[in-house]
Amino acid sequence: MATNESGTPFRAISQSQHCPEAWDMVTYAAMKNYGVAFSRLRKSRFRSRFHLSEADRRYIAEKGMATIRRHCEDFIRTRLAPANPPNDGKQTPMRGHPVFIAQHACACCCRDCLAKWWKVPRGVAIPAERQQGIVDFLMAWIERENAP
């Protein structure tokens, strides 16, 4: 049993046991403030090196943004939202789809990156409305990158 500064015992609560508070107060607000979030990501040497290729731009032009959004929703729902995604940390390829590039650029590629950058607790499924926030964030990055 843990104790506080005065020696009073208390039951430690893991971050995953209070997911809504952690998400609502930190992550969702940070992701919705795209300018601040993108500025923060640009300061990372690793994150700032990701950009859409010409092939990615052609793919977006061929498929349209509505299709890219559907792909994004599917990738987030199946590869990122489960409490313990299969192959976590390796589930997002480094190339091959504009959404994959956006996920790495925006630190939304695995649960470890979501936890580190956006305080999304590990081991807790991401609810549908929060998945939509991640999708909106990734699509905003793609739209910025794809702008002429």
Stretches found by the model and what they are:
Residues P86-C106:
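Immediate flanking context of iron-sulfur cluster ligation sites
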Residues D112-Q132:
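Iron-sulfur (Fe-S) cluster-binding segments and ferredoxin-like electron-carrier domains
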Residues A30-I76:
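Core of compact, soluble alpha-helical bundle domains
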Residues Q132-P148:
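Short Fe-S-cluster ligation motifs
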